[in-house]
Amino acid sequence: MFDMYIESGGKKLRCGYTTGSCAAAAAKAATYMLFNKKDISVIEIDTPKNIKLNLEIQDIQVEKNSISCSIVKDGGDDIDATSGLEIFAKAEEVEEGFELCGGEGVGVVTKEGLFVEKGQPAINPVPREMIKKEVLSVLPKDKGVRITIFVPRGREIAKKTFNPRLGIVNGISILGTTGIVYPMSEEALKESIRIEIRQKAVNNKDLVFVFGNMGERFLRERGYKKDNIVVISNYVGFSIECALAQGIKDLTIVGHIGKLSKIAFGCFNTHSRVSDVRLEVIALELTLMGYDLELVQKVLDQKTSEGAVRLLGEDFPMLYERIGEKVLNRLDIYAYGEANFNILMYYGSKEMKLLYESKNSNLFD
């Protein structure tokens, strides 16, 4: 077991290693065994973080002109759909040089805008370099080798990853910029968002941001079909910056009042541990509109913005319009006026109802 830990939220969490590290280790081990005619049980590789990994080799299969083996992906304490997967590499002798191929269970890129060209196996640039470096370190100088990375359960597990959203089909991606998996990594999630924005920006002049699956469901239930929706989690500011960097000038943000209202107070990370001003936004607007303090206090006594909306009912359109306009103003300030923003604000979960839609919104035209 990989014995490296970090602290997050007061908890000690075990790190893991990426699919890229697994592929590099399996490829190195298969190459070594092919040309040295002997089995090994452990292989050492370097990672871009300069952390050495000693990984156990599994499922060695010897054929006439090739050898394959696997490394089991260990995601540590991270919530990782690929943890426990066997990542295989097959090494075959060729006349000269180094070749890298993707086999069964490794996804294929079908859209422009990713770090790998359309039509190529979804093995990202850093893992490609890791695989090549490790293989060449054990490949005899006068020999050539073809490496095929394959993942028997890759098609099945890919359905639980970002790949379907990115247009990567038939398998998982071989990923990792550091070689190490850091549990609950904010940076890893942000990088996934950045990649999706970059990919969606290739064929779209406008993007629609949603905070999660609920926002996407809200749109799909109303017949929205365009492939320009990006799930941004809580990272509003970061996602706007990524979109602007890709030349996107028209952005629509669709979200529950509990998320969107935070932006009215200038909160561009909407996670509750960073910003929890949902009820205060509603209460302030009611006060400014002249409602009595008894009603304002009832709103503040609610546990959620959902509770506040249900308390008030749907007879406060001016309230939601005022909140919506403040959200739009904050978005405009954040982007220095470089983008056109629209918002759709809803409440509810099983049955979602629209509270406010900005005047220039045309999502359903």
From Swiss-Prot:
Pathway in which the depicted protein is active: Cofactor biosynthesis; adenosylcobalamin biosynthesis; cob(II)yrinate a,c-diamide from sirohydrochlorin (anaerobic route): step 6/10
GO biological process, one term: anaerobic cobalamin biosynthetic process
Coiled coil: none
Enzyme Commission code: 2.1.1.195
Keyword rRNA processing listed: no
Molecular-function GO term, any one: cobalt-precorrin-5B C1-methyltransferase activity
Catalytic activity as recorded in UniProt: Co-precorrin-5B + S-adenosyl-L-methionine = Co-precorrin-6A + S-adenosyl-L-homocysteine
InterPro entries in the cross-refs: CbiD (IPR002748), CbiD_sf (IPR036074)
Entry keyword set: Cobalamin biosynthesis, Methyltransferase, S-adenosyl-L-methionine, Transferase
Family named by the database record: Belongs to the CbiD family.
Name of the protein: Cobalt-precorrin-5B C(1)-methyltransferase
Classification lineage: Bacteria, Bacillati, Bacillota, Clostridia, Eubacteriales
